[in-house]
């Protein structure tokens, strides 16, 4: 039996909280196990001056950490699942997903502002194409300002730049004990969450049977079903670059209900859809919803977005 596990993690306060949380889950189920953190800085942490979509997308937060696993410098990696692309490097596996935290988006408005009370032409901070798309589809007058960094940095920059507020994930604020800054919780009907939002991803080497055995008690079956559907949707729509899409699944009994969205960043064209089916077909349901969205206009949106991305890169 293993007596020592090394967990690779980013150095942000939220990432460290998540890694320590997984460490605590492990030691509670395996008394005597020693856990140490391998703290790392990723490209996503270093390049904060440009929107994430302009510097390589969400995968920038995981590449160095995944390499540490492959090199044997760590045994486990803990990520936010929403930061992960649909395809993992060969040799790595999503070994466990603990129970999902609240997946909803929230608005943190200065002076108690909510999306309903934002003045005309208000400036709102977010680094997410998805959140920008959804907000602009509801409020075309709003001016989106790119605000990147860890949670505390984004909140500070929102205040420093005199923005009306910022859109963030409930889960991160809750984990950091910062719920008092929330002025409005946005239901999925208003702001459909990102694929994997609120879910911790525990990754390890595919051939590391001892680590995989340690992680079995941390797996939450219902969360796995939901993210299987969501990530199947993502895999069909991702297209190799960061795109404005959302996907959120819930499980009730033997049924999974998946909602999806693809839109232009400016919110002028948004395609929404949903599908229900048996949990045993979670992956197929994700692919089916992706096909439905593509047939109703998402393909055009994604092609246009890819062309713009390629033009910017050339």
Curated annotation (Swiss-Prot):
Pathway: Porphyrin-containing compound metabolism; protoporphyrin-IX biosynthesis; coproporphyrinogen-III from 5-aminolevulinate: step 2/4. Its EC number is 2.5.1.61. It is an enzyme of class 2 (transferase). It comes from Myxococcus xanthus (strain DK1622). One of its GO terms (biological process) is protoporphyrinogen IX biosynthetic process. Tetrapolymerization of the monopyrrole PBG into the hydroxymethylbilane pre-uroporphyrinogen in several discrete steps. Keywords: Porphyrin biosynthesis, Transferase. Its cofactor is dipyrromethane. The modification S-(dipyrrolylmethanemethyl)cysteine is found at residue 241. This is Porphobilinogen deaminase. Belongs to the HMBS family. It catalyses: 4 porphobilinogen + H2O = hydroxymethylbilane + 4 NH4(+). One of its GO terms (molecular function) is hydroxymethylbilane synthase activity.
């Amino acid at each position: 039996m293993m007596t020592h596990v090394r967990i690779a993690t980013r150095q942000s306060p939220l990432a460290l909280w998540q890694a320590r949380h997984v460490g605590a889950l492990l030691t509670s189920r395996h008394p005597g196990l020693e856990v140490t953190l391998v703290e790392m800085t990723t490209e996503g942490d270093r390049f904060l001056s440009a929107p994430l979509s302009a510097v390589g997308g969400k995968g920038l937060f995981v590449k160095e950490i995944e390499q540490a696993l492959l090199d044997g410098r760590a045994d486990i990696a803990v990520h936010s699942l929403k930061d992960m692309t649909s395809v993992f490097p060969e040799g790595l596996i999503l070994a466990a997903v603990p129970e999902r935290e609240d997946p909803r988006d929230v608005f943190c408005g200065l002076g108690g502002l909510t999306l309903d009370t934002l003045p005309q032409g208000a400036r709102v901070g977010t680094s997410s194409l998805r959140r920008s798309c959804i907000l602009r589809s509801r409020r075309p007058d709003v001016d989106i300002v790119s605000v990147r960094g860890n949670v505390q940095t984004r909140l500070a920059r929102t205040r420093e730049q005199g923005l009306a507020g910022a859109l963030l994930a409930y889960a991160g604020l809750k984990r950091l004990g910062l719920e008092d800054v929330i002025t409005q919780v946005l239901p999925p009907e208003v702001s459909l969450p990102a694929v994997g939002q609120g879910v911790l991803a525990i990754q390890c080497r595919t051939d590391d049977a001892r680590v995989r055995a340690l992680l079995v008690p941390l797996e939450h079956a219902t969360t796995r079903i939901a993210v299987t559907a969501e990530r199947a949707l993502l895999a069909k729509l991702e297209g190799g670059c960061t795109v404005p899409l959302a996907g959120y699944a819930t499980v009730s009994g033997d049924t999974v209900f998946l909602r999806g969205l693809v839109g232009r960043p400016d919110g002028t064209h948004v395609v929404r859809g949903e599908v229900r089916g048996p949990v045993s077909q979670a992956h197929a349901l994700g692919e089916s919803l992706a096909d439905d969205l593509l047939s109703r206009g998402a393909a055009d949106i994604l092609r246009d977005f890819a062309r713009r991305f390629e033009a910017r890169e050339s």
